[in-house]
Amino acid sequence: MRLIPLQTSEQVSRWAARHIAERINRFQPTADRPFVLGLPTGGTPLQTYKELIRLYQAGEVSFQHVVTFNMDEYVGLPKEHPQSYHTFMYRNFFDHIDIQPQNINILNGNTEDHDAECRRYEEKIKSYGKIHLFMGGVGVDGHIAFNEPASSLGSRTRIKTLTEDTLIANSRFFDNDITKVPKYALTVGVATLLDAEEVMLLITGYNKALALQACVEGSVNHMWTVSALQLHKRGIVVCDEPATQELKVKTVKYFTQLETQAIQSVL
């Protein structure tokens, strides 16, 4: 696992966006050989999306031959709802780049058969071979996507009941009214994420410090699904200084020395 300890969330976003752009450009995707990118929603990746848009506008990256798969979507929330993840992705990213509409994949939380929708999603991912890079965020309780604590580390795309902690955290997007937050979501599984060629997690803020500690220093544990990243051969965690507060000093120093070049690239 790589841990890239930066100073600020702005540096985290800038490094992550540049890494994505570099991966796409190095891959040299074509219509017959697209680059497959996994994407999250939420507050953490917002600045990364803004930076990717800036790189696109500067002519430094194109999404013409990029296929995307989003992590999750609420169940029962219309696509047009202002807080649906469909709306989030188009408003904050897709509407501002040259991605082809047919290359955008987001789970449909309004189908009559959720199990069938989840199977379809898994098959669609497999049809491209693999996801080349999956970017993600992390919840305060260490969940990745909507794989809440005690989720199976071998799980696949499925419907999940959201925990009270998640409902409270997400209520800020619903007028701070927890009763308005959907209670269920469709989400890729932990194993789905681990199947990706590379997984990059963005962890920022004091409130994510325990999750970062569990990810980097803890044991692999289904109560902290983020810890499953330890099993991945190409896992990257990009964090800011506040998120490192629960890590051992020697851990931060170790990775700071290892990642000197990466750190200097955003200074």
Swiss-Prot record:
Q: Which UniProt keywords apply?
A: Allosteric enzyme, Carbohydrate metabolism, Hydrolase
Return one Gene Ontology term, BP aspect. carbohydrate metabolic process
GO molecular function terms listed in the Swiss-Prot or TrEMBL record? glucosamine-6-phosphate deaminase activity; identical protein binding
Q: Where is this site: Part of the allosteric site?
A: 151, 158, 160-161, 254
Q: Which cysteines are joined by disulfide bonds?
A: none
**S-adenosyl-L-methionine as a keyword?**
no
Which pathway is this protein engaged in? Amino-sugar metabolism; N-acetylneuraminate degradation; D-fructose 6-phosphate from N-acetylneuraminate: step 5/5
Q: Does the keyword Isomerase apply?
A: no
Q: Which Gene3D superfamilies match?
A: 3.40.50.1360
Give the stretches traversing the membrane.
none
Q: Which residues does the entry assign to the active site, renumbered to this chain?
A: 72 (proton acceptor), 141 (for ring-opening step), 143 (proton acceptor), 148 (for ring-opening step)
Q: Can you state which reaction this protein catalyses?
A: alpha-D-glucosamine 6-phosphate + H2O = beta-D-fructose 6-phosphate + NH4(+)
Stored InterPro entries: Glc/Gal-6P_isomerase, Glucosamine6P_isomerase, Glucosamine6P_isomerase_CS, NagB/RpiA_transferase-like
List the record's Gene Ontology CC terms alphabetically. cytoplasm
EC number from the UniProt entry:
3.5.99.6
Q: Which family does it belong to?
A: Belongs to the glucosamine/galactosamine-6-phosphate isomerase family. NagB subfamily.
Its subunit composition reads: Homohexamer.
Q: What is this protein called?
A: Glucosamine-6-phosphate deaminase
Q: Which gene encodes it?
A: nagB
